[in-house]
C-alpha cells in the first residue's frame, strides 16, 4: 500500500472548523447519557441549595475562581445539561490549543488529542459533581492557553494567565506541566537535539513556578474580597505529603499502570488501549535510539516519557490532606492524548499509513471510555432516583410527627437525621448514597421540601445525644420530635 491516496485524505490535511465540529458532536454523543439522565450526589444535594452556603468552602480551599463562577455567576445553580455541554465544548477547545502546543500538524493528530482529552473517564467523574461542569474545563483551557503563551515567548502573559488556573481547579497545574513535558518530548523527537527540548521544559517550568507564586499571593489576599477565611486545606505541607507515601503507590498502580482499581466501569477495552498507547510511547523512544539518536538523546527522551506519568499527580507531593482520587488526576487524559499525538507524528515521518495505528488505538480508547461514561451515568441516575424515592417515603412521616407536635406546617421544620450505617441503594455499581453522607443527610430532605430547616453543628450533636436509643426506620417511633426538632432515626 502506497501513501499516495492518504496524502489527499482530509485526515492528513489541516485541522479545520469542520473537524472541530465533528469532534464536538462525537463528544456530545459519548456524554449523551450524562447529559440526559439527571443525578444528584451528596455534594450536589447541598451545593445546589444556595441557602447552605456550601460554595463558600471553595474559597476556603483557595479555589476562589471556582467560588466566583459557581457562587456568583451561576448563583449556586448548576445549570443542568447546558453546563455539561458547555464544559465539553470548552474541553474540546482546550484540546485544540494543547495539541498545537505539543506539535500536532494534521487533522488526525488534532482529532485524536481533542477526543481523548474531552471523552475522558476522569472528566466524566468530575462532571458527576454538577458544580464543576464550567469551572473545571475552564481551568484546563486557562492552563493550556497559559502554557502555549509561555512556550511561544509570551512569558509574562503566560505566567499571569497560569495564576488563574489553580484558582478554578488545582489539578490544572498538573495539566499544564504534562503539556510542557509532552511539548518538550515532541521537540526532542522532531529536532533530535537535547538543547531545544530542555530549553522548552525549563521555560515552561519557570513560567509555572511564577504563575503559582502569583496564585499563592492572590489566594492569601482573597479573604479581603471574598470575606471567606482560608482553611488548612489551602496550605502546602511537603513533608506531611511525603509521609503519606501509600497514596503514590496507589496512583502508580491504579492510573499510571492502567488497572482502574478505583474507577467504576473501567473496562477491558480502555485498559488494552492505554497499554497499547504505552507500548507506542516505548516504540517512539526506541525508534529514536535505533535511528542513531545517541545515548544522551535517548535517555532524555525516556526521562520525559516517564515524566508524563508522574506530572498528573505531582500535587500529591504538596499536601497530605487530599486522597487524590480520579477527580484530581485529570491530567492522565492529557498524557494519553499526548502519546497518541507523539506516535502519530513520529509514524507519519516514516509512512502515513503507519500513523493510522495509533489513531485506531485512540479511537478504541474513546469508544471504551464512552461506554464507561454511559454506564456510570446510568448507575448514578438509579442511585439518585432511589435516594429521592426513599426520602419521599420518610418525608410523609416527618410531616405527621411535626403536625402532632404542633410545629408550624408553613415551616421552617427543624430536622436532624441519624444515619450511621449506610448501605447502597444502587441497582448496579455505584456505592455512594446522598441519604447517608454526613453533610447531605438533612439537606436531601430540604431538596425535596424547602420547609425543612437542617440542623447542623453542635446543636445537631446535642439533639442526637438526647435522642438516645430509638427504633430504626421504618418502625413506629423512628421519627419523633425533641425540643421542637424532628429527628429521623434511620439506623
What do these predicted regions represent?
Residues 155-171, 175-181, 206, 210:
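Membrane-interface alpha helices of multi-pass inner-membrane proteins
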Residues 2-60, 64-65, 70, 74-116, ...:
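Intrinsically disordered, polar/acidic, low-complexity terminal segments
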Residues 200-279, 316:
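Membrane-lumen/periplasm interface segments of specific transmembrane helices
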Residues 176-209:
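Perimembrane helix-loop-helix junctions
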Residues 38-41, 119-129, 216-225, 286-290, ...:
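Juxtamembrane "helix-exit" motif on the non-cytosolic side of transmembrane helices
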Residues 59, 63, 108-151, 167-168, ...:
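Membrane-interface micro-motifs in multi-pass membrane enzymes
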Residues 93-95, 265-298:
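Hydrophobic, aromatic-rich transmembrane alpha-helices
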Residues 136-162, 179-189:
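Specific aromatic-rich, kink-prone transmembrane helix
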Amino acid at each position: 500500500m502506497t501513501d499516495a491516496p492518504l496524502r489527499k485524505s482530509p485526515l492528513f490535511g489541516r485541522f479545520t472548523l469542520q473537524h472541530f465540529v465533528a469532534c464536538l458532536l462525537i463528544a456530545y454523543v459519548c456524554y449523551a447519557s450524562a447529559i440526559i439522565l439527571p443525578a444528584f450526589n451528596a455534594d450536589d444535594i447541598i451545593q445546589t441549595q444556595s441557602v447552605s452556603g456550601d460554595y463558600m468552602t471553595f474559597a476556603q480551599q483557595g479555589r476562589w475562581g471556582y467560588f466566583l463562577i459557581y457562587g456568583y455567576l451561576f448563583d449556586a445553580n448548576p445549570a443542568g445539561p447546558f453546563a455539561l455541554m458547555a464544559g465539553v465544548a470548552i474541553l474540546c477547545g482546550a484540546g485544540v490549543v494543547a495539541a498545537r502546543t505539543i506539535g500536532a500538524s494534521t487533522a488526525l493528530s488534532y482529532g485524536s488529542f481533542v477526543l481523548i482529552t474531552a471523552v475522558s473517564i476522569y472528566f466524566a467523574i468530575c462532571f458527576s459533581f454538577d458544580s464543576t461542569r464550567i469551572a473545571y474545563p475552564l481551568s484546563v483551557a486557562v492552563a493550556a492557553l497559559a502554557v502555549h503563551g509561555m512556550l511561544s515567548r509570551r512569558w509574562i502573559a503566560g505566567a499571569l494567565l497560569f495564576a488563574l488556573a489553580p484558582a478554578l481547579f488545582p489539578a490544572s497545574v498538573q495539566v499544564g506541566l504534562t503539556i510542557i513535558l509532552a511539548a518538550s518530548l515532541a521537540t526532542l523527537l522532531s529536532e533530535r537535539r537535547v538543547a531545544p527540548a530542555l530549553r522548552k521544559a525549563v521555560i515552561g517550568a519557570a513560567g509555572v513556578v511564577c504563575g503559582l507564586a502569583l496564585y499563592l499571593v492572590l489566594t492569601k489576599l482573597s479573604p479581603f474580597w471574598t470575606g471567606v477565611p482560608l482553611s488548612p486545606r489551602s496550605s502546602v505541607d511537603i513533608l506531611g505529603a511525603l509521609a503519606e507515601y501509600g497514596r503514590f503507590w496507589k496512583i502508580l498502580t491504579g492510573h499510571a499502570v492502567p488497572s482502574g482499581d478505583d474507577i467504576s466501569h473501567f473496562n477491558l477495552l480502555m485498559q488494552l488501549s492505554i497499554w497499547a498507547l504505552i507500548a507506542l510511547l516505548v516504540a517512539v523512544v526506541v525508534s529514536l535510539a535505533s535511528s542513531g539518536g545517541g545515548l544522551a538523546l535517548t535517555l532524555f527522551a525516556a526521562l520525559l516519557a516517564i515524566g508524563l506519568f508522574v506530572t498528573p499527580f505531582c500535587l500529591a507531593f504538596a499536601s497530605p490532606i487530599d486522597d487524590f482520587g480520579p477527580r484530581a488526576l485529570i491530567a492522565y487524559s492529557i498524557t494519553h492524548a499526548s502519546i497518541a499525538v507523539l506516535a502519530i507524528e513520529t509514524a507519519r515521518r516514516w509512512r502515513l499509513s503507519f500513523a493510522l495505528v495509533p489513531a485506531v488505538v485512540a479511537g478504541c480508547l474513546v469508544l471504551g471510555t464512552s461506554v464507561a461514561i454511559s454506564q456510570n451515568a446510568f448507575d448514578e441516575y438509579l442511585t439518585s432516583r432511589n435516594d429521592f424515592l426513599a426520602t419521599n417515603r420518610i418525608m410523609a412521616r416527618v410531616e405527621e410527627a411535626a403536625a402532632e407536635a404542633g410545629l408550624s406546617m408553613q415551616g421552617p421544620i427543624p430536622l436532624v437525621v441519624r444515619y450511621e450505617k449506610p448501605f447502597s441503594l444502587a441497582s448496579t455499581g455505584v456505592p455512594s448514597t446522598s441519604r447517608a453522607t454526613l453533610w447531605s443527610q438533612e439537606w436531601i430532605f430540604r431538596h425535596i421540601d424547602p420547609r425543612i430547616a437542617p440542623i447542623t453543628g453542635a446543636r445537631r450533636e446535642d439533639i442526637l445525644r438526647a435522642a438516645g436509643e430509638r427504633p430504626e426506620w421504618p418502625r413506629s417511633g423512628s421519627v419523633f420530635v425533641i425540643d421542637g426538632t424532628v429527628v429521623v432515626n434511620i439506623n
